[in-house]
Structures are given as structure tokens and as C-alpha cells.
Amino acid sequence: MAKAGDKSSSSGKKSLKRKAAAEELQEAAGAGDGATENGVQPPKAAAFPPGFSISEIKNKQRRHLMFTRWKQQQRKEKLAAKKKLKKEREALGDKAPPKPVPKTIDNQRVYDETTVDPNDEEVAYDEATDEFASYFNKQTSPKILITTSDRPHGRTVRLCEQLSTVIPNSHVYYRRGLALKKIIPQCIARDFTDLIVINEDRKTPNGLILSHLPNGPTAHFKMSSVRLRKEIKRRGKDPTEHIPEIILNNFTTRLGHSIGRMFASLFPHNPQFIGRQVATFHNQRDYIFFRFHRYIFRSEKKVGIQELGPRFTLKLRSLQKGTFDSKYGEYEWVHKPREMDTSRRKFHL
């Protein structure tokens, strides 16, 4: 019985302490509210003395209250600074300094020494002598072969068929167990200029190999975020047979310049603008976003775009000299995450 009495007395003391702590918190909150209502800010030294750390408060409710008051104080100081800056800009009028540009990962990018200068003589010489020179000199016209990995599933097959409607003069061929080393000589003999291979894993497309014929290079991409036409909301009607316009964005380095020229060589030279179709390869933070749109002219001054599909995202894994050779091929560039991904502000394309 004595033990039961001790337990009841100790529990009663604990409940009294909790009530006292709750009343103290309510009084502190009420005092804080009254101070803010009267327009008088509590002194910083009293609320947060030098060397004060909120994490040192052992009482959870008290710690939460102090943290809330600290956040409110920070918010008020930030708002007051914004109002002060706005008044100063209004007072200066046209003489006000320009607004600072917000910092992003893109505009804080680490400078790459291989950034391409269009007026550089060395760049012009490389463009005139590289593997894509015959295409850009209009000596050859693109002819594309699109194939898959062995035993493709329906989603991969539909992606290949839809890609063939995006890229003019492209043909879909099913592997039937043939190795790529046997397919490439047959492509060269039939005057194909490029070979596209869509790989899959667990019935989902997850890779793309693009090989320029007959002398390479060969690029291997990781493919993600694949959306077929039926999966795109508010999509337009199926694309027409007009040659689309091609847009390449943000391929600035020597490596990115080569990849951009590789994509450009898939499409014929003279787009048919009457079809109002455009294929976009947009590079952002080394991710290449592919979109296929149609322009919608609502008036003489207003224009919109309507996505046709498909859409997907590519990430470059390697660039190999020559045609596809997994054993003895010479690689120009290979993505090594542990060595290359040391900074979020460093990009390679």
C-alpha cells in the first residue's frame, strides 16, 4: 500500500509540474503576442542572448516555442529589409541599380576550358574534317535504321515505331538475334548513315545507342522518363510526314558540340516549315530532354505549342570512336561518377 501511495504522489507531482509548465508557456506566448500587437519588438538580447542555442533547452514544449519565436523574428527582419529596399528603389526611380540575378546551379556553373567558341579557327577546322562533315556539306542525306535489343516487349516496339514517325527517312528493323557487329556492315552496304538501338530492362526502355556510319562515333545514353503518345495529356494529333525543324540547346563544350552535331545529322537539311513541327534536344545539367511539338498560331502575334510525343530524357554514358565495338573500341569519353561528379556545378556537355 505504501508503494501505491508513493506512486500516486509522484504521478500527482508530475501532473502539477506539467500544468505549471503549460501555464508558463501560455503566459510567455501571450506576452509575445501582446508585444507584437503593440508594435514593440522584444529585445534580441533577452530572447536570444549571445551564445544561446535552442537545442540546449531540454523541455520539448519550451524548445518548440523558442524555435517558433526565432523563426517569426527572422521572417519579420527579412520582410522589413524587403520593404526598406523597395522604398529606396522607388525613391531612386530610374537611377535605381538593376535587380540582382538569382543564383542557380546553371548560372553558377564551373567554367570548362573546352567551351566552344564559334569564331575559333581550330573549331572550324575540326567541323570541316570530322565524321559529320559530309552531312553538313550536304554531300549525304540521312537514312536511319532503328532497332531494339533481343526479344523486345510492346513498350519498346511502340517507342521505335513512334521515333520512326519523328525522324524522316527512318526504318524500323527487328533484331531476330543478330549481333550489332553483323548488323553494322549490312547497314553500311545499304547506305544507312545512322543506327539507333533501343535497349530495355524489365519491359521498360532504359538505354539508347547512337552510331554514326560508316566511321562513327558511337554514343551510349541512359534513357529515362519515357512517355509514349497515349501517356501524354492534351497531346496533338499524330505528326504529319513533313520534315521537322530541329532545335539544339546548351551544347557548349567540345564534347557537347560533338553530341549536338550527332543529333543534327539525324534530320534532313531543309525543314518544311509548313508542317509546323519541331524536334527539340535541350541540354540542362548534362541531361538531354527530347520533346516533339507542333506550333499553334492563334493570331498574327500569339503562338503556342502542342506536344505530339514521344518524350524521354537521355544521359550520356560514353562516346566511342568508330562504330560499335564493346571489346576493342577506343573511347573518347566515359562517365565516371566517383571522379567526375565531385561538384554539382560542374557539367560536361
From Swiss-Prot:
Residues 142-325 form the Brix domain. The keyword Hydrolase does not apply. It is found in: Nucleus, Nucleolus. Residues 303-320 are annotated as: RNA-binding. Residues 1-105 are annotated as: Disordered. Residues 87-97 have a biased composition (Basic and acidic residues). GO terms for biological process: maturation of 5.8S rRNA; maturation of LSU-rRNA. One of its GO terms (molecular function) is rRNA primary transcript binding. PROSITE patterns: BRIX. It comes from the Eukaryota. One of its GO terms (cellular component) is nucleolus. Keywords: Nucleus, Ribosome biogenesis, RNA-binding, rRNA processing, rRNA-binding. May be required for ribosome biogenesis. This is Ribosome production factor 1. It comes from Homo sapiens (Human).
